[in-house]
Amino acid sequence: MSGTFHGDGHAPMSPFEDTFQFEDNSSNEDTHIAPTHFDDGATSNKYSRPQVSFNDETPKNKREDAEEFTFNDDTEYDNHSFQPTPKLNNGSGTFDDVELDNDSGEPHTNYDGMKRFRMGTKRNKKGNPIMGRSKTLKWARKNIPNPFEDFTKDDIDPGAINRAQELRTVYYNMPLPKDMIDEEGNPIMQYPRNKIRTTKYTPLTFLPKNILFQFHNFANVYFLVLIILGAFQIFGVTNPGLSAVPLVVIVIITAIKDAIEDSRRTVLDLEVNNTKTHILEGVENENVSTDNISLWRRFKKANSRLLFKFIQYCKEHLTEEGKKKRMQRKRHELRVQKTVGTSGPRSSLDSIDSYRVSADYGRPSLDYDNLEQGAGEANIVDRSLPPRTDCKFAKNYWKGVKVGDIVRIHNNDEIPADIILLSTSDTDGACYVETKNLDGETNLKVRQSLKCTNTIRTSKDIARTKFWIESEGPHSNLYTYQGNMKWRNLADGEIRNEPITINNVLLRGCTLRNTKWAMGVVMFTGGDTKIMLNSGITPTKKSRISRELNFSVVINFVLLFILCFVSGIANGVYYDKKGRSRFSYEFGTIAGSAATNGFVSFWVAVILYQSLVPISLYISVEIIKTAQAAFIYGDVLLYNAKLDYPCTPKSWNISDDLGQVEYIFSDKTGTLTQNVMEFKKCTINGVSYGRAYTEALAGLRKRQGIDVETEGRREKAEIAKDRDTMIDELRALSGNSQFYPEEVTFVSKEFVRDLKGASGEVQQRCCEHFMLALALCHSVLVEANPDNPKKLDLKAQSPDEAALVATARDVGFSFVGKTKKGLIIEMQGIQKEFEILNILEFNSSRKRMSCIVKIPGLNPGDEPRALLICKGADSIIYSRLSRQSGSNSEAILEKTALHLEQYATEGLRTLCIAQRELSWSEYEKWNEKYDIAAASLANREDELEVVADSIERELILLGGTAIEDRLQDGVPDCIELLAEAGIKLWVLTGDKVETAINIGFSCNLLNNEMELLVIKTTGDDVKEFGSEPSEIVDALLSKYLKEYFNLTGSEEEIFEAKKDHEFPKGNYAIVIDGDALKLALYGEDIRRKFLLLCKNCRAVLCCRVSPSQKAAVVKLVKDSLDVMTLAIGDGSNDVAMIQSADVGIGIAGEEGRQAVMCSDYAIGQFRYLARLVLVHGRWSYKRLAEMIPEFFYKNMIFALALFWYGIYNDFDGSYLYEYTYMMFYNLAFTSLPVIFLGILDQDVNDTISLVVPQLYRVGILRKEWNQRKFLWYMLDGLYQSIICFFFPYLVYHKNMIVTSNGLGLDHRYFVGVYVTTIAVISCNTYVLLHQYRWDWFSGLFIALSCLVVFAWTGIWSSAIASREFFKAAARIYGAPSFWAVFFVAVLFCLLPRFTYDSFQKFFYPTDVEIVREMWQHGHFDHYPPGYDPTDPNRPKVTKAGQHGEKIIEGIALSDNLGGSNYSRDSVVTEEIPMTFMHGEDGSPSGYQKQETWMTSPKETQDLLQSPQFQQAQTFGRGPSTNVRSSLDRTREQMIATNQLDNRYSVERARTSLDLPGVTNAASLIGTQQNN
């Protein structure tokens, strides 16, 4: 191929035109590219590290303590030893000269009186540690970022910045400078051991610490005080030891549970600390001192190793998983022996199954022992020295790894510490790591060794090397690291420097993959490693009921105090009453006076009425919540078979919160969508390629009144036909070894034909150049497929990037591997190597990525060129396009902008690709600045961004891409269900506005009847409200509130909004971008207006938002409106939002598992959220809301009966009940019914819960649990306590309690049997009456609980040890009066409540009672068991079923739950007014899918010429009207020639959405021209 093409309005010039050929007779010589030659003669300034200084905000004490030294450009050197003279901080932000030792030339500082400490990472001038190990671990606690700070640094943890200033220097094979050692020659700096301990206890501290921890619980302290009081005889406790049994049992059970949990952590700690790695021996590590191991530590070490070996043996021989691993290991060893042989190298190095194809692709291995140092090699290994035979790598434990050690990690081994990578088995110094344990991401990541040490291969090489590393301090940020490798060049004696970034670091917790070995120097150990600094615990959450339960407990404490106070006063008054037997028989009693006796009686009453605050309540609640979590985990309908992932509860104590959720905050990418990117369309040189029928497009056409099912079938059939044609032509085009037809997503037979030259040579070369740019500008890795080694799988950190590279591969531009210098691309069957000079990585603030490729000169003597390829957001790229004449064709820019607008309207994610060609001198000047910025330790990221920004300008547009992120299965149905349940959904996404809007339409979040209220800081609103962004946002909020809702944003309106939990009546939706949201969250007044506006809208879309903004929005709603919030996401950028919400849901998706690890519940797909919330959440809330008041009610009966008894014995503290009754009332007699009520009760089954989601609203309105209900149950308990006591008392008072032999039953314990039996049967029957689910299982447990009281009375009273209670059962149960009183009292206890419930259910049925009646009449029989409306494979209901659905929708479910005015007869009537599904104004109450209008050709033309359309196209453009007219002419021409679909333009004109950040053709052109 010959010839050139220039920027003449057709296409940009290709700098690759002379570097590759596509004719069949191409030779390998044409593919050669000259390698890069590194300049050995570079001056020290190029590699020197800039001077470290402090800013004005640095605390004084931090400046004084910064004693690390750095080498500057003006470093002085000793003439004999070439040792640098460091400069130490003098406290003023500068550095003073430091005296060198005359003998060694090492820098030193005098530290008089310095003391050595074992732990700590830094010392002050007195020798005391500034940061100890315990304090180091505290840095793991991370807070949610401030939403009002600069969001360009959202990924930086403030704690990480502070600790990063604690600089450290590590020397290898060199003596330490004198300022770094003390008088004894030991290093001053002390680093944490690599041994970690995550356990709470040790064998010696378990008992005291665990007991102390348990008694942080106020309830335990309360009951301990009661036991202590009971130990004193004066308080009249019959058996003090027996009274302690319940608390002792609870403490023991809890201690056993804690011991089991901690033992698991102990086992894990032992496994980690005793994991083996390979550490270099023979070279003394000067950075750490030798430990003096005490005899006690030796004893502990021996025991821990024995314990570890025992645990390992048990795991391998007793567990199925261990047996399987043992067999796999044996098979692997056998395979290695067969492969390697007895004389081969050891298996740890050469028995690794490596499928990777990267740096060593197609090249023979090299013998590095005989390798001579080349001219371009960094002169760091002194090969003139004789090899040391004493240096070797030996196995050691992780806990023995120290800072400064050289370690070697083998394939599939975990990294033992944070390590600077020196070399790898890869000839190019690359290795692959899996960071799943660190950040949850499953994609492999590449790490590169330092260039200066890449040739190190053996222990002999590393022993002949000397260097030191200057590093920042430890911090928790996983994605940044700054350091410098320094060494003295052997050739000229000058100090050389190579910057170290996070790409040169292996972090602890990661696993080495597909690399035989990697070698590095340990920089951080133990608590200083990033994984330990990030090991903060997910914030502890308590459910709303648990929080409100505390108030109920306080009420009971108040009641307890009143009862005790009355008892004490009454007993004191009765004490002085004349004529009492006390004066004759109790002279000189312990109390001694009325006041003292009243005081003692108060505490006696506290012991007596203690069951008012039941200790068993907390245990029962924990049992119930644990069982609920187990049921959620075991639900097979929440199991994702594709991921092999069930719904996993991480927080077991908030299941009831799932039943009260009012607001759901959702991410879009990977949550609503699959995050599986498919390349669908592209625009190259003004020509659009690709066919796709996306879900967003289907939603758009559905709103236009088109039959999308028919059209979808037709479109998909035509696409499939074109796909087959395209695949056949691609096969005939070239010999693409990486072509796999089943993976093709880009369908365009026109593109393949243009690739052959059908539209001319210019368009052909444009297509080739565009795809080559996609194949070069990326950070993707390739890995051989285990099942098919010839097939290369793409491993990318971003699914978008993988889609771009995969499409380039599909059309013949295959990325097949990396080398040390660049990339290997197979172009139409011919492999070429492209040298990559620099990669400017993507981040959230840049929104772009670039690479610089070296292009050889046309002739052997010509100067090479450099080509910058840049890809990024369309608005970013257009703002950086060159405006020079002849650089970018205006027509192509307009066509590309219109294509991108069309793609975005179809719901596709758009990117632009551009380039810039540089002369070699321009590149070298820029690269010098880049090297200086890269070597900076302070603000390296900021400096690199400034340098990158300077070159990513004056770009030439190549084209644009469009990628589809498909909706997850069942998302539209799930959102519709949640809306019908009354739950409001807010979408918080970092994606573009138009993409979010189209996804909103396609997933039923938005409908065509909604009016979108846009909040932005640009566009026409600037003229109306002013130029200040904050003024614009404030004015827009005030305008919308007043115009649409007649609100002002006052505090009174917020107070009223807290009471209103109804679904918004209006048909409005909010759209706001990140810039406007940042201002809306700043300031109390504007924040209040924003919140009120959003509350009154049906849907809220926050686009282009940062992670901290997501968290801020959630906290704003949760704290200001006092509502239950749920956040759901799948990526690391959703963690802050998930942890801020009351309930956090993580989706196990494509972006890793970090969101899952930080969540409260983890699910496999978004659609499972409906079942989790509407079924399990509603059940859990309803069960717990009924169980808790029942618990207080039954204790109220039992305790108040004692109070009524006190009236007749002067409140002297006598026990009415035999003491074992006091113990077993809550433990055995009445506990099981309420516990099983909280675990198993169901008002309706799971299918009905999903088919009738309106039942969920009772949780939003908090009708099931409130203080009113609690007080009502307490009053019921008060009434029944009166019946339980006074019915037996009246019989006793009339002397009616006699046995068949005439003996009386006048003992108080006998009366207590009457009271206890009546109370137990009444309570258990009361629970049965309030239980919806009556089956044999629940009936069995209630019957057993009722029988236990009779059984225990008979067993215990038959024992002589019962003393006064002896033979009580025989005498009482043999008396007819007992059975008469028993039945009458139970009847009177339950009759009022039974009457009230029956009246209410018949005349004022609640919604659930109406639905239950329908259920009994068979209206839901047509639904199969486990029917899920969100399941895309659900069975279709029959006509009878549809008829049933119509009846269900017609139920008059009232907004006032529990107060419906419809009788039971209305349930079976078909003529029912639909008041629930629609508001009072007739508007839909949920996200209803609407059918709208169709457009005729005439209407289309009228709309295009209407002022409304013109207004819709003016957003974001400059003042020039020529731009608009030129773009409109281009648009009309493209529509006329079928290059642009007019339906999209009509839709945009119809809706007239003036949206922020929308990919709008006019705004893009305006951005480029205003640049």
Swiss-Prot record:
Cofactor: Mg(2+)
Phosphotyrosine modification, residue list: 368
Resulting phenotype, residue 551 to L: Decreases phosphatidylcholine and phosphatidylehtanolamine uptake
EC number, as in UniProt: 7.6.2.1
Ranges annotated as biased composition (Polar residues): 42-56, 80-93
Annotated compartments: Cell membrane; Endosome membrane; Golgi apparatus, trans-Golgi network membrane; Cell septum
Family annotation (PROSITE patterns): ATPASE_E1_E2
Cross-link type Glycyl lysine isopeptide (Lys-Gly) (interchain with G-Cter in ubiquitin), residue numbers: 895
Region (Disordered): 1-94
Modified residues (Phosphoserine): 53, 81, 92, 104, 351, 354, 358, 365, 1506, 1552, 1563
GO molecular function terms listed in the Swiss-Prot or TrEMBL record: ATP binding; ATP hydrolysis activity; ATPase-coupled intramembrane lipid transporter activity; glycosylceramide flippase activity; identical protein binding; magnesium ion binding; phosphatidylcholine flippase activity; phosphatidylcholine floppase activity
Documented effect of changing residue 618 to F: Increases phosphatidylserine uptake
Pfam families noted in UniProt: Cation_ATPase, PhoLip_ATPase_C, PhoLip_ATPase_N
Modified residue annotations for Phosphothreonine: 70, 85, 94, 109, 1551
Active-site residues, record numbering mapped to chain: 667 (4-aspartylphosphate intermediate)
Reported phenotype of the disruption mutant: Decreases phosphatidylcholine and glucosylceramide transport into cell. Simultaneous knockout of DNF2 leads to abnormal endocytosis and abnormal cell surface exposure of phosphatidylethanolamine, phosphatidylcholine and phosphatidylserine. Simultaneous knockout of DNF2 results in cold sensitivity, and sensitivity to cobalt, nickel, zinc, calcium, and magnesium ions, duramycin and cinnamycin (phosphatidylethanolamine-binding cytotoxins) and papuamide A (phosphatidylserine-binding cytotoxin).
Binding positions for Mg(2+) per the UniProt entry: 667, 669, 1130, 1134
Effect of mutating residue 586 to A: Decreases phosphatidylcholine, phosphatidylserine and phosphatidylethanolamine uptake
Positions annotated to bind ATP: 667-669, 801, 842, 844, 847, 871, 909-910, 989-991, 1104, 1110, 1133-1134
Protein family per UniProt: Belongs to the cation transport ATPase (P-type) (TC 3.A.3) family. Type IV subfamily.
Biological function: Catalytic component of a P4-ATPase flippase complex which catalyzes the hydrolysis of ATP coupled to the transport of glucosylceramide, phosphatidylcholine, phosphatidylethanolamine, and small amounts of phosphatidylserine from the lumenal to the cytosolic leaflet of the cell membrane and ensures the maintenance of asymmetric distribution of phospholipids. Does not appear to transport sphingomyelin, inositol phosphoceramide, or phosphatidic acid. Required for efficient endocytosis.
Name this protein carries in UniProt: Phospholipid-transporting ATPase DNF1
